[in-house]
Structures are given as C-alpha cells and as structure tokens.
C-alpha cells in the first residue's frame, strides 16, 4: 500500500500546480503508478476519483494520466499483459462524462486523445466510438440532461440540436425550452450583429409591454419578435447573472485561470450546445426574437405570471412561454447562428454596452460585443445543456435553463441572448428592455437586484458573472439536466455551483460568485462586495506565500500554532577520518558563513559545528547533503544536530529532519528562552506575544550565534568576562615589557588610555576573546565571536608558553567594558569576517576614528602584545591564540592583526571606534588614518590575509615568545624569528649576533621576532607619532612588511625605509619561508606559540616602547654598529624581512631607526634561524 499511497500523493499534487502539467510531472506520476501495478485496481480507482473530484481545468490532465499510464504499461509489459487498459475501460464511460465537464476549449484535446487511442489501438473502437459520440453530443440528442451532466456535446451536437430545435417549436414545452436556449442565443447574437438590433428596437417600441410569457401560440413573426424582445428585456434582468456568468467565464478563461476552469468548461460546453442551437436557429430570423422573448417571457412569466423571482431563472417556468419562445426561436433560427457568436461577443461587450439595457441587467460581461466566438456556444447542445452547453460562455444560461427550459437559459448561455438582444435593440431596445429587464431581473436570478435599474444590475452582474460563471456553468449543466423542475433546479444550481466553485479552490471570488448566485435574490452589491474581498484574500494568500518563501530561504521551518520554534544552527558532520583536523572541517563549512564553534570528537569520527546564522547552516546542509563531499579523501555525512540549549526535557520535541525543536508555549518558561539559543536561535515569529523580553532574547541569541557579527554590544559584555580571565593570564606579559613606554604615550589620555589599554588588551584579547569567550565565558564570548569555539583547540599550544606578567591586567579589567565592544567587533568582523589583518580592521575600523586614535594606537598594540603575552598565560592567551586559530572562519585573520603592529591597532581602533569616547594616542591616530586612506589599509589586510593566516598561527607564535621573551628566553629563540626573540630574551645579544651576524637587519626581524620588534616598535611607534606619513608606512608595514622579502639587504632596508617598503612583498614571502625552516628546526607547537606571540609582541613592541626595549636597543646599538657590515649580509632573508619591516617603520623616524638597529642586531644573534638564512642574507648585505 505504500506504493499506492505514494501514487495517490503524486497524483493529487497536481492540484498544487497550474496547468499545463509538465512532462516531468507526468513521468513521475506514471512511474508511481507502474510501481504500484500489483494494486492496479487501486491505482485505477484513484485516477477515476481524481477526475471526478478535480476542478475542470484538471480534467484533461487527468485524462493524460490515464493515457500515460496505459501506454507505458503496454510498452513495458506488452499489450497482452497490460492490466491498466482493461481496468480503465470498465468504467470509462462514467469517467469521460466527468472529463467532459472540462472547459469547452479543452474538449478538443479529449477528442484528440480518443483519436490517438483509436489510431494506436489502445482501446477497441467499440469503447472509443461512444466516447467520441459523447463529445459530439450525438449520444444524448434526446436527453438534454445527460448532455448537461456529461458536458460532452459541444461540436457535433449543433447539427442534431439544430434539427431538434427546428422540431422543438412544435414539440412540447420542454423541448422548446431546451432548443430555445440555444436558438435564443443564436437569435440574440444575430440580432446584435445585423439590423436585428433595429428591428428589436422597433418591436420593443411597438410592444413595450412585457411579452406574454406563455404566448406559445404567437405564430406571427412580429409577435415572435416582440416576444423575443420583451423576453430579452425581462430576461436581461433575470438572466444578467447568467450572462454575467457566461461572460465572466470567458473573461476568466482568458485572465483568471484559477477560477475559470470549472465555469469555463461548463460554459464552453454550454456554448457548444448553443452553437448547435444557433445553427438550427439560423433557419428562422424571427426565431431569435422569439428566443429572446422566450427568455424574456420566461422572466416575465415568473414576474407577471408568478411572483417567484427564483422561478424565472430556472423556470421561465412558463412552459407556455418556452413554447412561444421556441416558436420565436424557429423564426429566429436564421439569426441564431449569427447571433450565437454575436451574443457571446456581446456578452463580453455588454459590460460596456449600456444600450443593451438587458445586457447590463444580465451581467455586463456580454457588454463587449465580441461577435466573435460565442457561436461555439450555440454549437454545444442546444437541446442538451442548452443553457449551459448551448452557450459555452453562457454558464449562466445553465441557471435559467431549469426554469427557462432553456430557452431563456440558452440565451444567457449563448452570450446572454437576452443581453445580445438588448444589444440588438441596443439603441431603442435597451431602454425599453431596461425597464422590462428590471422586472425580469427580479423574476430572474436577481430578484433583489432586478428592481434596481437594469444598468445597475448590469454592472453588478458584471462583477458577479465573472465570479459566478465558473461556479454557474457546472451548476447550470446540472440544472439543465433537471430542467423539468425549474424551481428545484434553481435552488440546486446555487448549491451545486457553490460546490463546484468550492472544488475550484483557486479563486475565492468564484466561491463568492457562486454564493452570490445562490443569493441572487439578495442584492448584487453584496456579491460585488464579496468579490471585492476576494482580491484581498488573494493578496493575503500571496503575502503569506511570499512570507513562507522568505522563511524557507532563511532555512526556517514551518510555523506551528502556539508552538515556539527553536531552530538549531548546529550541524553534525560524520564519517570523518580520525586524522581530520578542526581546520579541515572549518574549511569545508566556512564558505557558507561564519562558524561559531567546532567540537571535534575524533573517536566517533564526527564533529559538531555551530554556525552563526541559521541560513548559513541550512545552505550548508542542503549543499553538502546532496553531493558526495569528502574530507581527507573520505565521504562525509551531514545532518542537523540538537543544539546545546535544548535540555533533556525538550528533546522529545526535536525534529531532526527540519532541525527545529517545536516546544508548546505551555511547556516553555519565558526565563528559559535565552538558554535555548545556545547553538541555535529562536524563531521570533513563533514566540508568544505575552512573553516579555523575547525580542531581546532573540537578539541575544542572534548575538550568541552570530557572535561578533550579530552585535558588538553583546560581545562586549561577553568580553568583559573574558577580560577578567585574560587578566590572570595577562596577555600583557609582552605588554608589560612594552607597557612602561607605551603607558606614558597612552597616558596622554591616562584614564582613557588606561581603560583603553586594557580594552586594547581586551581587543587583542577580543580577538582571542572570541575563542577566549568560549574558554572563559563560553556563553557570552562564543556568541559574539565565531572563533570562540575554535580558539580553545588551537590556542593551548601557542599560548601556554608565554606567561606574561599581569601588569596590564588592571587595564584589562578596566577596559573590559569598553574594550569588549571594540575588540569584539574587530574580532568578529575583523578577525573572522575580515580575517584579512589587523590592518584592515584597523583601517576600516579606523577604530581610531571612533575612539581617540591616540589612546587606541597604544591599546591596540598593547592588546596584541597582551594577547601574545596571554599566550604565555594559558587561560586568556590560549583563547586569544585560539581566536586566531579559530581561523576556521577567520582565526588567522585575527592573528594577522596581531602580527602587524599597525594592524593590531587598527582592529583595536575598530573596536575603539565602537568606543568613540576613548581618546587615542597620537601614534594610534596616525596609524588609524593611514589605514583609513585605504590604499594601504585595504591592501595590507588582503596581503596579510593570504600569507598571514597560514603563517600567523605557526610563525607568529615564535615572534610572540620573543616579545614574551622576557618570560621565555628559550621560547623566544625558538620563535619563528628565533634570533630576535633570543636576543631580547638573552640580554647578551653578542652571542646571538655572532650566530645571526647576517641578521643585523634583524631590525626587520624584530617585527617577526617579537622581542626585537618590541624594541624597534617603540621607535616605530614613535615614528608613527612623529611622522605623519606613518599611516601609509604603517599600512605598508602591516601589509607589505610582513610580506616584505627579507632577501634584500637588511642594511639597505634598515638604512632605507623605502627599500623596506619595496621589500614588503618579499618579506611576506620570506615569512612563509621562515615558517617552513622553523618548522624543520622546531616543534609545531613552539611555532604556533611563537607565531601568535610574535605577532602580538611585534605589535606591542611597535606600539609600546618599553624601557626594556630601550635598554636593549642601547646595548644592541653598539652590537648592531659592529655587525652592521658583516652580519647584515649574513642575516637570513627571513629574519631580515621581519627586521627590515620594523626597520623601515623605525627608519621613518631616524632616531627610532637608530634605536631599532641595536635591537635588531641582538635579535639577530639570538635567533638561530639567522645562521640558516645567512647565506642568502650575506649576499644581500653587500648590496
């Protein structure tokens, strides 16, 4: 039964699509049917049920389903073993009766399918021929009801109907009623087309009195004409709804595909009948008049003979009236063929045509005199569905058909013969007709409206018809079948129409129109109002659909009533190789968006990745679950994971397919909402309006998920938490070294500077804090920063070594409030998002601008240093490093800022910009602006990104220890530029110098090696403050210096700062080279520690001129002078690059340059890499 259920769902999903149905959809349905072939009887029954219950526009697609299933089965299993064909043939007659309820324009498609079946021998001719006859209307020449029910007779019936019509006049009332409907239609159409309009006018003038409804005895053509005219006038009001319906059907067919289908099909079928009737009617010109009168008579009969307005619609119950109408129809037959098309057209035109007083009465629909194609209506079944079928467009006639035996009905069906006739009598007739129609209208379907002037009814009807036609046609057909009981039919029609209108759920307006029809007695204004609401309802539906589409694009699941949706942003990635690293997973997912954290579980071969945004997680899941994606040559699986915020009590509500936890409102405590956001987010659309603070909680949730991206303010709060942690670790150790000198410079804004410095730490920490947050204040920091999750993993190795003193701790504690915001923004946006470099962050943030650049520059530098120092301190530093390591989504970018002293200040500046009140030291201000210029600010970030992210984690740690050098002497030496670190750590730079004599360019190394850079950086920092162009140079330092090639003469670079800038690219390359060399000599952990430390310390040294650095510079100055000649040449290009960068910055200020050189020389001696690089550097120094 699973296959049957699958087929059922596939088939009925057609209702969700708009015809025509695509070939791919038909293939899916056919495949589902073939799969369920064992239960082929169920499949056949489902298809038949679909055809029976679907809207008219889906009838033909249902036939195509039968055709596709049978042909595929015959092709796949052979004609002998095909089970579907014989099974469908058992009930095929009833099935085609429902199929012929389709829009009249689709009937040709049904005939085409039958012809193909006959040609290809799908079914026997004995089965197909009756179906073709049914389509032609031949099968039910006698029983109009059948035709109406089947809605099959549109093309062929015309001939038989015409003959029947000819006979009908003499025949009993019922036949007359049937024939008149189509004949009247044709007659009316003809009258409109030809001079009949004038004739009708004359007749109306002559016989303005309402025609005698039951004057079948009127044999004279004049009497017939008069009756036709009067009938038109009276029926126009009574039929307006019907005509409206027919016209509406046509309009809807063309424009409103949703509603029209049913009505259109019915109307078309009726039109076919009408066309056939029209053909017969052509015989007698007076007949049209008579037909009109028949309808009019019918109307008058209800109004005059009997007071039942409803009766008129169905009853034109003057059977006598029908007879006269029929007689008239005979006379009008000549006009009928022409009139049929005309009437249909007129129905369209009638809306505009006021002259057709009756037209207005009917439904303005016929107003447009589209003489064109209403003829088809006549063709359908004049006798059969005369009102409805006879007039394809005239679904409305079907309504009258019951009462009007179809004389009146046909007219409405025809194109509103009544209307058409008014059109015929357009000038004169309309007016007389108008008054008369007023009566017929009441008698007709619009008792209430009828009193209103015909014109008003016309407009009202126009509105109704459009809506009504769809519902009316099917109902009309039914009514025609029940013509004998006009009154009953009328009552039933509204309901049936309603039901049908309901079936086509496409249009609410349709349903409204149906309801209106049933309420014809009520005012049309009401129907109009309903119709007016329908567009609103449709627009509301459209808005709902658009909103749902937006929610799907955002990855949000469906909303359940009174249920809070906690959408997970956590993804589970499984089947990972045990060697898979966090970086591998991050590289897989970071393309989709920022990552908040990654939790690796190697024993299980899986990882839990918390994305910042639900949309990013949704896109990652959609893409990675479709293709065969591999990590380390091993295919992975991905799925939603329950977010951490969902406690065990709520796991029962977890939906793994949608990645959402649906928690009923009564189970949710408002205070728990915030906790739900961990690893997920609250769907604000599903929250109880009574919960207070929910908006904030969602924001927090966003902040937590989005971390830095979401909001800097929140990160700030988390950062303060991290700040306390960092304080113990004191990323400040490096800062401590540099802090004394920097403190004075920062002190210019002492309070702010003090706070800023701690913030500076915090920002640097902020960079780490993201990782840090997860470590120390996991909840707050992680949300603000993406790295937090990752940082813990990477930081430990690099950060443990540097254990700097907590001198900066106070600043950290002080700045936390301010710093967190600033640092967080940079970290989040800069580290992750920009990941490019501190420079970019600093330049963009120019954090300087928001905050006092003067204070900021120092804090940023201090912060980087503190971060590096923090590395030494396991708690904070580890996190800080991790922040870079969180490079998963930009950790390295975070490191990059640390690497470049100017870069670090900029990120801090950015953070400080968050804290505009803070004053920034002049140095920082200068740096900020230079990056701001953009030329350098932009490039450095990018350049830094490329080289730094990889180098940052490993290379910088070495440099970091160098700065931290005071603490870890050996670690410093091991730093990527170990030489410089060692010199600083080892006061006797002579030995180091001996080792790294070629590294006399160590001034440049100092940047790479934090100790020397720290010393040099003070001068550089001074240079920044002293030289206004430092901004550009700083940018170069950050962007180029790190990348600068150390191959060039360190001395030249050191001596010529321009050279240093030129060599910035080389240095960057050399940094990359150094990392490999160092990797060879040192452990990865040491590298990472040094690299992180290095960057931070370089910035710290540059930003802060520490007394130690000054002293070392003094000592090293002598050594540098001695070694300047030989050591520079010997100095390895890598170390030279780092030193050169610093030198160039230092050289910007001559005094600074001098100081830096001594520092560099000790660094050279200290770093063991120097000797390795000596050969290359030796060549350079001679330059």
From Swiss-Prot:
Positions carrying N6-acetyllysine: 49
Biased composition (Low complexity): 381-398, 411-428, 1006-1020
Pfam family, any one: RRM_1
Xref: InterPro entries: CID_dom (IPR006569), ENTH_VHS (IPR008942), Nucleotide-bd_a/b_plait_sf (IPR012677), RBD_domain_sf (IPR035979), RRM_dom (IPR000504), SCAF4_RRM (IPR034369), SR-CTD_assoc_factor (IPR051485)
Keywords: Acetylation, Methylation, Nucleus, Phosphoprotein, RNA-binding, Transcription, Transcription regulation
GO cellular component: nucleoplasm; nucleus
Ranges of biased composition (kind: Polar residues): 457-469, 1136-1145
Domain CID: 1-139
Main localisation: nucleus
UniProt cross-references to SMART domains, sorted A to Z: RPR (SM00582), RRM (SM00360)
Subcellular location(s) of the protein: Nucleus
Composition skew (Basic and acidic residues), residue ranges: 488-498, 538-553, 1047-1122
Domain of life: Eukaryota
Biased composition (Pro residues): 367-380, 399-410, 429-440, 800-823, 920-952
Record PROSITE patterns: CID, RRM
Residue ranges annotated for the RRM domain, each copy included: 569-643
Residue span of region Disordered: 299-324, 348-561, 691-722, 800-858, 920-1183
Basic residues biased stretches: 499-536
Entry-annotated residues carrying Phosphoserine: 154, 717, 1042
GO molecular function: RNA binding; RNA polymerase II C-terminal domain phosphoserine binding
Known role: Anti-terminator protein required to prevent early mRNA termination during transcription. Together with SCAF8, acts by suppressing the use of early, alternative poly(A) sites, thereby preventing the accumulation of non-functional truncated proteins. Mechanistically, associates with the phosphorylated C-terminal heptapeptide repeat domain (CTD) of the largest RNA polymerase II subunit (POLR2A), and subsequently binds nascent RNA upstream of early polyadenylation sites to prevent premature mRNA transcript cleavage and polyadenylation.
Subunit details: Interacts with POLR2A; via C-terminal heptapeptide repeat domain (CTD) phosphorylated at 'Ser-2' and 'Ser-5'.
Name listed for the protein in its UniProt record: SR-related and CTD-associated factor 4
């Amino acid at each position: 039964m699973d296959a049957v259920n699958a087929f059922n769902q596939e088939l009925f999903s057609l209702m969700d699509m708009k015809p025509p149905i695509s070939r791919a959809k038909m293939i899916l349905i056919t495949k589902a049917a073939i799969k369920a072939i064992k239960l082929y009887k169920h499949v056949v029954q489902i298809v038949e049920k679909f055809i029976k219950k679907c809207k008219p526009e889906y009838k033909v697609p249902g036939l195509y389903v039968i055709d596709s299933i049978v042909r595929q089965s015959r092709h796949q299993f052979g004609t002998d073993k095909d089970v579907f064909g014989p099974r469908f043939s058992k009930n095929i007659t009833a099935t085609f009766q429902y199929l012929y309820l389709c829009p009249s324009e689709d009937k040709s498609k049904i005939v085409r399918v039958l012809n193909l079946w006959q040609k290809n021998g799908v079914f026997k001719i004995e089965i197909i021929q009756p179906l073709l006859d049914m389509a032609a209307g031949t099968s039910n020449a006698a029983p109009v009801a059948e035709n109406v029910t089947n809605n099959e007779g549109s093309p062929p019936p015309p001939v038989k109907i015409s003959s029947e019509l000819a006979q009908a006049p003499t025949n009993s009332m019922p036949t007359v009623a049937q024939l008149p409907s189509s004949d009247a239609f044709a007659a009316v159409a003809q009258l409109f087309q030809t001079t009949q309009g004038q004739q009708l006018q004359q007749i109306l003038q002559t016989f303005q009195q309402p025609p005698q409804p039951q004057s079948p005895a009127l044999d004279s053509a004049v009497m017939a004409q008069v009756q036709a005219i009067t009938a038109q006038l009276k029926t126009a009001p009574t039929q307006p709804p019907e005509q409206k319906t027919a016209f509406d059907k046509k309009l809807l067919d063309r424009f409103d595909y949703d509603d029209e289908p049913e009505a259109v099909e019915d109307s078309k079928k009726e039109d076919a009948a009408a066309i056939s009737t029209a053909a017969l009617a052509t015989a007698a010109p007076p007949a049209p008049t008579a037909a009109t009168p028949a309808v009019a008579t019918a109307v008058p009969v209800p109004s005059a003979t009997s007071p039942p307005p409803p009766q008129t619609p169905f009853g034109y119950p003057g059977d006598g009236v029908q007879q006269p109408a029929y007689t008239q129809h005979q006379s009008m037959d000549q006009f009928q063929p022409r009139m049929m098309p005309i009437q249909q057209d007129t129905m369209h035109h009638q809306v505009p045509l006021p002259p057709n007083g009756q037209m207005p009465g009917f439904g303005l629909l016929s107003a447009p005199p589209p003489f064109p194609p209403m003829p088809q209506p006549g063709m359908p079944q004049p006798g059969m569905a005369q009102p409805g079928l006879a007039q394809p467009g005239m679904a409305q006639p079907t309504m009258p058909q019951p009462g009007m035996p179809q004389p009146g009905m046909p007219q409405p069906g025809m194109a509103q013969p009544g209307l058409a006739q008014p059109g015929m009598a357009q000038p004169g007739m309309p007016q007389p007709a108008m008054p008369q129609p007023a009566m017929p209208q009441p008698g007709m379907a619009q008792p209430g409206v009828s009193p209103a002037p015909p014109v008003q009814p016309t407009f009202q009807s126009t509105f109704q018809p459009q809506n009504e036609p769809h519902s009316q046609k099917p109902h009309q057909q039914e009514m025609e079948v029940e013509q004998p009981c006009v009154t009953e039919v009328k009552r039933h029609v509204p309901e049936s129409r309603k039901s049908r209108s309901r079936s086509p759920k496409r249009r609410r307006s349709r349903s409204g129109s149906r309801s209106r029809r049933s309420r014809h007695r009520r005012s049309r204004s009401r129907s109009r109002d309903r119709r007016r609401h329908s567009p609103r309802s449709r627009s509301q539906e459209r808005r709902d659909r658009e909103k749902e589409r937006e929610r799907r694009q955002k990855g949000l699941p469906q909303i359940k009533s009174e249920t809070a949706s906690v959408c997970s942003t956590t993804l589970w990635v499984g089947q990972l190789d045990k060697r898979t690293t966090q970086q591998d997973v991050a590289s897989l997912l970071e393309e989709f968006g920022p990552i908040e954290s990654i939790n690796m579980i190697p024993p299980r071969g899986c990882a839990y990745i918390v994305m910042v945004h639900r949309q990013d997680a949704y896109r990652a899941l959609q893409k990675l679950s479709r293709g065969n994606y591999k990590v380390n040559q091993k295919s992975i699986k991905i799925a939603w994971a329950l977010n951490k915020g969902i406690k065990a009590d709520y796991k029962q509500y977890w939906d793994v397919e949608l990645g959402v936890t649906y928690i009923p409102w009564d189970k949710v405590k408002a205070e728990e909402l915030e906790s739900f956001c961990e690893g997920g987010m609250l769907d604000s659309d599903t929250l109880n309006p009574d919960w207070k603070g929910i908006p904030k909680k969602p924001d927090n949730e966003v902040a937590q998920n989005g971390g830095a991206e979401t909001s800097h303010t929140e990160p700030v709060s988390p950062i303060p938490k991290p700040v306390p942690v960092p304080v113990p670790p004191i990323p400040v150790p490096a800062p401590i070294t540099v802090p004394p000198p920097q403190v004075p410079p920062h002190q210019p804004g002492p309070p702010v500077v003090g706070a800023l410095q701690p913030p500076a730490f915090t920002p640097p920490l902020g960079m780490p804090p993201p990782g840090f947050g997860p470590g120390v204040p996991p909840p707050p920091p992680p949300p603000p920063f993406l790295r937090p999750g990752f940082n813990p993993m990477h930081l430990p190795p690099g950060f443990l070594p540097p254990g700097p003193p907590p001198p900066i701790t106070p600043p950290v504690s002080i700045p936390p409030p301010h710093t967190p915001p600033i640092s967080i923004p940079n970290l989040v946006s800069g580290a992750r998002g920009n990941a490019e470099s501190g420079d970019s962050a600093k330049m963009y943030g120019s954090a300087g601008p928001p905050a006092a650049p003067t204070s900021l520059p120092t804090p940023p530098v201090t912060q980087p240093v503190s971060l590096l120092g923090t590395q030494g301190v396991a708690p904070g530093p580890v996190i800080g490093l991790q922040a870079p390591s969180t490079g998963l989504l930009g950790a390295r970018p975070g490191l990059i800022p640390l690497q470049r002293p100017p870069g670090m200040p900029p990120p801090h500046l950015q953070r400080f910009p968050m804290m505009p009140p803070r004053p920034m030291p002049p140095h920082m201000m200068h740096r900020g602006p230079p990056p701001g210029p953009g030329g350098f600010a932009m490039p450095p970030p990018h350049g830094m990104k490329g080289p730094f992210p990889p180098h940052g984690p490993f290379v910088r740690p070495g440099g970091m220890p160098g700065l931290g050098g005071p603490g870890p002497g050996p670690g410093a030496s091991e730093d990527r530029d170990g030489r410089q670190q060692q010199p600083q750590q080892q006061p006797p730079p002579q030995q180091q110098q001996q080792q790294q004599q070629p590294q006399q360019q160590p001034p440049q190394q100092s940047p790479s090696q934090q100790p020397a850079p720290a010393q040099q950086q003070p001068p550089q920092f001074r240079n920044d403050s002293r030289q206004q162009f430092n901004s550009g140079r700083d940018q170069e330092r950050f962007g180029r210096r790190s990348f600068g090639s150390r191959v060039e003469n360190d001395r030249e670079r050191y001596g010529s700062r321009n050279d240093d800038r030129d060599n910035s690219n080389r240095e960057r390359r050399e940094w990359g080279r150094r990392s490999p060399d160092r990797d060879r000599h040192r452990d990865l952990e040491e590298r990472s520690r040094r690299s992180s430390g290095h960057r931070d310390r370089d910035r710290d040294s540059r930003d802060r001129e520490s007394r130690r650095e000054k002293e070392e510079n003094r000592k090293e100055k002598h050594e540098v002078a001695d070694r300047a000649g030989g050591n520079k040449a010997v100095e390895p290009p890598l170390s030279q690059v780092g030193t050169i960068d610093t030198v160039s910055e230092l050289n910007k200020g001559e005094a600074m340059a001098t100081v830096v050189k001594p520092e560099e020389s000790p660094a050279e001696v200290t770093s063991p890499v120097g000797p390795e690089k000596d050969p290359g550097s030796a060549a350079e120094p001679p330059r």
